Amino acid sequence: MLPKELVRFKELGNQITILTAWDSLSSAIVEAAGADVVLVGDSLAMFIHGHTTTLPVTLEQMLHHTQAVGRGFLSPKNKQPLVVCDLPFLSYQCGEDKAVAAAGTLLKNSCAAAVKIEGAEPEVISVIERLIRMGIPVMGHLGLTPQSVNNLGYHRQAEDALGQEKLVTQALKIEQVGCFSVVLEHVPSKVASKVTQMLKIPVIGIGAGEECDGQVRVTADLLGLTDKQPPFAKPLIDGRSLFIESLTSWVDQLRN
């Protein structure tokens, strides 16, 4: 699937489904589940590498995991989900040339067909414009942006009128410069719905209500694999307990 094809989903009113994967095992499962898009998220810093934020993950680690994701797909190339990879912290904030090099490294050496970038500050917008001119598709990300945790924390964003006006302005700018879609994270459903109606490009929600053009979730959150989930990502099963019980049963059988 090409990034621009997601616009057709919006035109037809078809919900876009995005799940994370970080290795070949998870990508095979997510592909089998029928997700439209696989996001190799920098959240792997926390879920895989044990960090408390996304900030420590490196470009080399993102490349390593995206390559592993590509090896897990079983469908023919033209039937595989679209793969979007997060550009990690400080891979694009330090200038356009560094951003092009980072995104180019991912697209040249892995299955990624697009990158995701957080924010819409003037410097970030310039980077996005440059990447798109270079032929690199970009997904935007607004609202709660985890790479800005030291400034924003993990609180819900755009709760007052000023914040909502800013979010709308940023979303319009993201569309104007050529992003093929935008993620809205942890914002009120009312403003997310407004943005969804205003934009021609797909708006993907996570903790942004049900009226977006699609939803993205961290696979480990949906499967209940951690002992703590964000309030907007209710687990479908208690996978952690299921795994522990199954493995405990095996250990006990051997010991007894």
UniProtKB/Swiss-Prot annotation:
Predominant location: cytoplasm
Pathway the protein takes part in: Cofactor biosynthesis; (R)-pantothenate biosynthesis; (R)-pantoate from 3-methyl-2-oxobutanoate: step 1/2
Any Pfam family hit: Pantoate_transf
Gene Ontology cellular-component terms listed: cytoplasm
GO MF annotation terms: 3-methyl-2-oxobutanoate hydroxymethyltransferase activity; magnesium ion binding
Cofactor requirements of the protein: Mg(2+)
Reactions accelerated catalytically: 3-methyl-2-oxobutanoate + (6R)-5,10-methylene-5,6,7,8-tetrahydrofolate + H2O = 2-dehydropantoate + (6S)-5,6,7,8-tetrahydrofolate
Compartment(s) of residence: Cytoplasm
Biological processes per GO annotation: pantothenate biosynthetic process
Keywords assigned: Cytoplasm, Magnesium, Metal-binding, Pantothenate biosynthesis, Transferase
InterPro entries xref list: Pantoate_hydroxy_MeTrfase, Pyrv/PenolPyrv_kinase-like_dom, Pyrv_kinase-like_dom_sf
EC number annotated for this UniProt entry: 2.1.2.11
Entry binding sites for 3-methyl-2-oxobutanoate: D42, S43, D86, K116
Catalytic residue list: E185
Cofactor-binding details, from the entry: Binds 1 Mg(2+) ion per subunit.
Enzyme kind, highest EC tier: transferase
Described function: Catalyzes the reversible reaction in which hydroxymethyl group from 5,10-methylenetetrahydrofolate is transferred onto alpha-ketoisovalerate to form ketopantoate.
Protein family according to the UniProt entry: Belongs to the PanB family.
Name of the molecule in the record: 3-methyl-2-oxobutanoate hydroxymethyltransferase
Encoding gene (name): panB
